[in-house]
Every structure is written in C-alpha cells, then in structure tokens.
Regions:
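Active-site microenvironments that recognize anionic phosphate/pyrophosphate groups
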Residues: 1-59, 70, 82, 94-232
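Conserved short secondary-structure elements within globular domains
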Residues: 65-77
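An acidic- and aromatic-residue-enriched active-site/binding cleft used to recognize and process polar
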Residues: 75-78, 92-94
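Histidine-centered nuclease catalytic patch
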Residues: 85
Length: 232
C-alpha cells in the first residue's frame, strides 16, 4: 500500500546516482529517471509532506520566472500524481504540448470571469478538448491571489484533501500563463474494464493537455481519436 512502500522522492530512498540540485530552501530539482518529455525534471519538496497545492502554488511561478525555457506542471493527489504522499511538481520541455501548440488559437476565444486589471485575470478556456480555466498574470502576487480565488470556487468532495485538478504553467515574455484543468474522476472507466476494452491510462497534466501516455504498447496501437477523448 501507499503508506507501507518507501517514498521514492525522499532523500534516503533515492538511488545514490540520482543527480539532485537544491533550488531553494524547500525544493530539490531531480532528473526524471523515466522521462516522458525530451527534457524532464521532478521537483520534490525536501520535507516529506502530502501533495497539496494551495500553499505551494507560488513555487510554480517562481520556477518559470527563473526558467522561461521550461514549463512546470502539477498533478493532484488523485489526478495523475505518482507520489500523492510527497509534495512535488514536474517540469520539462516548453512548447510541445498540444495545449501549448494550440494556445495562439485558444487564447483568442477566452471568456474572462475575474479581472484584476486589463492584463491579469482568470478566464474560461473554450474550444479545448477538456474544460479549463487560465490564470494570466504579470507578478507573483497577482498570480497567487487569482489562484486562491479560483481554488476556493472549485468543488471539493468530502473525502478529498483538495479540489481535483491538474495545472500546467509557462511563461511567454512578461506574461505568466497557468491553465487549471478541473477533474471529476481519478481514472476513466476503461481503466477498470476487462479484455480488449481495457486501457491502462491514468491521466495526469500531460494527458489532459493532449499528450496521452500509454504505459502498454497494446493500448497505444488501438488508441483512436474517439477513445482518446473518452479517456480524458
């Protein structure tokens, strides 16, 4: 079970040859040993603590303010997180997710719902494969203030530790963009199906952004556009 297995993000349990860099007083930067993206890092908290975003969202802004060539993403504890018991983000190659490659088109059809000023706001993303919100900001203070308002407005089930969500953040010039994707379920029905109907896909931020990861080759080979949409 989760509580019985050694946490693979804690210092004492990581392989000795795992390269690590301390990026601030709270987080390390690790090379992801199982990369999905051409450049792929894991950013675990130095202290073992649950995967919770509310008080840690600012770390995403800080990271891309220093590394504009990367995007950073967050998987909620039941939204694709590989270690729901240890706070972590991931970062990787910027600009290759379908969400990003289509952003110029998507950004032309946003519906603003909360605005701090003409440039900083929360909007609804239309025309994407899944419903989503976007936070557009120019400063860390505005980014965090807008995220807190969105977080508090999102539904949270009684047995969940936070509203279910994935977040993908990147920087474009002076503009910080965070797409927040609300989630209804941890895994699709096809995950629990039997025989040929089964697809072992547990969507995280990358999947919800249009880059579906299939651990089994057989699932990849039988994936269609219609099935891909049903998995999200």
């Amino acid at each position: 079970t989760l509580g019985e297995r050694p946490c693979f993000l804690c210092d004492k349990n990581r392989p000795k040859d795992q390269m690590s860099k301390q990026i601030d007083e709270k987080f390390h930067l690790l090379v992801n040993p199982f990369p999905i993206l051409p450049v792929h890092f894991t950013i675990p908290a130095r202290k073992h603590q649950p995967q919770l975003i509310y008080k840690n969202y600012g770390e995403m802004h800080r990271f891309i303010s220093l590394h504009s060539d990367l995007m950073v993403f967050y998987n909620g504890p039941k939204c694709g997180a590989s270690a729901p018991d240890h706070l972590h983000f991931q970062a990787g190659t910027n600009g290759i997710l379908p969400l990003q490659t289509n952003w110029q088109r998507l950004s032309r059809n946003l519906t603003d719902i909360i605005s701090l000023n003409d440039e900083e706001k929360i909007s609804v993303v239309r025309d994407f494969i899944v419903p989503a919100f976007v936070i557009i900001s120019k400063s860390a203070e505005s980014d965090e203030a807008l995220f807190r308002r969105l977080y508090k407005a999102m539904p949270q089930r009684g047995d969940e530790t936070e509203p279910m969500m994935n977040i993908i953040s990147w920087r474009k010039g002076e503009e910080f963009i965070s797409v927040v994707i609300p989630r209804e379920k941890h895994r699709p029905e096809a995950y629990f199906a039997e025989g040929d109907a089964q697809f072992v896909v547990s969507p995280g931020a990358l999947d919800m952004s249009g880059l579906i990861i299939t651990p089994r080759e057989e699932d990849f080979r039988k994936l269609t556009e219609e099935k891909a949409l049903s998995l999200l």
